[in-house]
């Protein structure tokens, strides 16, 4: 029984729910790990200038590729609801439409990105050797942008298709490809930043193109198949609105990172910026657990909402909040234990920087206790098709509250205010999330089953 295939229509116990979301959590963790390896290879084999250039230009393809996240989360919710309503053919048509829409729109953005790459890099502060590295790395990533968007989309749709394990193994394949090619192209063959970019491109072909062949095959055993489709303008618009929280999150991250770096340069100079970089790399691993759970459980919520199974919605809602609470405590405690070791791996060569990073990470890590509830809340409302509420939580959490905290807390607390800003933002966002959970129940009936 324990090995029986789990379906979206099932009743979910704690065990069944965890088994269903674990592949998605693993996918997010593995993606974070091979991203870290990518950065370490450039830093150690090419140098700090190349590493700085990669980090400088990386937000641009991340921003342009956000359409994949947006249509992946927003589209999978619509497809999941449609499956719950029992319309398999329409679900396949919507699935195909979302993939084609992402492919076309991101391809256009990739061309524009290549054309305007140099002026954007200069605007971000690149010049001289830094600009040269940024251009060489950025051009290749712009070419790979469509595959990057598809890879992001499939992370959500594999779960909706009841194939989270297959999605995990595609990610493992892409990650291993990236790491092996990084070592070969950057470390052994000496191809520099171009080698790192090519390794990323090839890995995205594994994660973004190979799944297309799987879903084209009509004999595959998943819930979804690619097929001939039509242009459903309203459905596409709804998917964009529904997934707008993902767009907001990625846009906000870039703006917030700029302000973080500005404040840290004021209070701690280059060491402050370096410490923040280490914290971001390490935080990816902890955030991945919360995001993995939220993304992995969202299609279940969409399906049962589409099926009007409010009893199961209540079951999923209550169990998820309890699990998030346990995970939050474990993640916060674990981060406190591993902080010295993680900091030493990145900056063990500098005692002053090591001490600053270790202290800053301990203060920053307090936000892990709150973050999970906000991440889940935003994803939960996306799964219910309420993109406006989801986007509101994301906007307040990742942009407005963080910007306000980063501006005002350092005025009172100095650099400690910078490290505490994210926790203050999560606390403010949690108040909004709880309020939305209470008020929106009148519409979606996930806390109380209607008579």
Q: Where are each of the predicted segments found?
A:
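Transmembrane alpha-helix boundary and packing residues in multipass membrane permease domains
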Residues: 24, 28, 40, 44, ...
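Small-residue-rich hydrophobic transmembrane alpha-helices
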Residues: 51-111, 148-167, 275-339, 371-393
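N-terminal transmembrane alpha-helices
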Residues: 8-46, 59-74, 78, 103-110, ...
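Transmembrane helical elements of multi-pass membrane transporters/channels
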Residues: 19-38, 140, 174, 203-207, ...
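Short alpha-helical transmembrane segments in multi-pass integral membrane proteins
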Residues: 1-21, 79-146, 188-243, 301-367, ...
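Short runs within selected transmembrane alpha-helices of multi-pass transporters and secretion channels
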Residues: 72, 140-159, 167-178, 196-211, ...
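Helix-terminus/linker motif at the lipid-water interface of multi-pass membrane proteins
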Residues: 33-52, 121-128, 184-191, 251-281, ...
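Interfacial/gating helices of multi-pass transporter permease domains
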Residues: 42-62, 129-133, 193-194, 235-242, ...
């Amino acid at each position: 029984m324990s090995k029986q295939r789990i379906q979206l229509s099932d009743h979910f116990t704690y065990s069944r729910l965890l088994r269903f979301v674990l592949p998605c959590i693993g996918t997010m963790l593995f993606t974070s790990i091979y991203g870290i390896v990518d950065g370490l290879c450039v830093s150690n084999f090419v140098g700090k200038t190349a590493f700085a250039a990669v980090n400088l230009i990386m937000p641009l393809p991340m921003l342009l590729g956000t359409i994949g996240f947006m249509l992946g989360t927003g589209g999978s919710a619509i497809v999941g609801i449609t499956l719950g309503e029992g319309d398999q053919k329409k679900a396949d048509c919507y699935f195909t439409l979302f993939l084609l829409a992402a492919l076309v729109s991101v391809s256009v953005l990739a061309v524009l990105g290549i054309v305007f790459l140099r002026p954007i890099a200069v605007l971000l502060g690149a010049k001289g050797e830094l600009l040269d590295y940024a251009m060489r790395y950025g051009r290749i990533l712009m070419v790979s942008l469509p595959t990057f968007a598809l890879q992001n989309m499939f992370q959500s749709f594999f779960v909706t298709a009841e194939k989270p394990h297959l999605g995990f193994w595609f990610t493992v394949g892409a990650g291993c490809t990236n790491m092996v090619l990084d070592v070969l192209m950057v470390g052994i063959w000496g191809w520099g930043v171009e080698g790192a970019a090519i390794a990323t491109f090839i890995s995205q072909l594994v994660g973004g193109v190979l799944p297309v062949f799987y879903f084209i095959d009509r004999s595959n055993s998943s819930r979804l198949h690619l097929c001939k489709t039509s242009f459903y303008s309203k459905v596409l618009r709804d998917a964009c609105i529904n997934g707008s929280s993902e767009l907001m999150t990625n846009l906000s991250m870039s703006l917030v990172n700029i302000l973080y770096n500005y404040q840290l340069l004021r209070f701690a100079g280059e060491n402050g910026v370096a410490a923040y970089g280490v914290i971001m790399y390490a935080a990816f691993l902890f955030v991945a657990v919360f995001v993995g759970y939220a993304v992995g459980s969202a299609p279940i919520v969409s399906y049962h909402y589409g099926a009007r199974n409010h009893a199961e919605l209540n079951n999923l809602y209550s169990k998820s909040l309890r699990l998030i609470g346990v995970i939050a405590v474990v993640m916060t405690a674990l981060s406190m234990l591993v902080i010295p070791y993680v900091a030493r791996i990145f900056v063990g060569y500098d005692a002053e920087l090591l001490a600053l990073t270790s202290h800053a990470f301990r203060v920053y890590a307090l936000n892990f206790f709150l973050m999970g509830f906000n991440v889940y809340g935003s994803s939960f409302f996306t799964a219910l098709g309420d993109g406006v509420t989801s986007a509101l939580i994301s906007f307040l959490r990742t942009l407005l509250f963080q910007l306000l905290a980063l501006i005002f807390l350092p005025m009172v607390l100095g650099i400690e205010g910078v490290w505490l800003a994210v926790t203050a933002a999560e606390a403010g966002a949690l108040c909004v999330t709880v309020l939305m959970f209470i008020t929106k129940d009148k519409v979606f009936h996930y806390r109380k089953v209607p008579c």
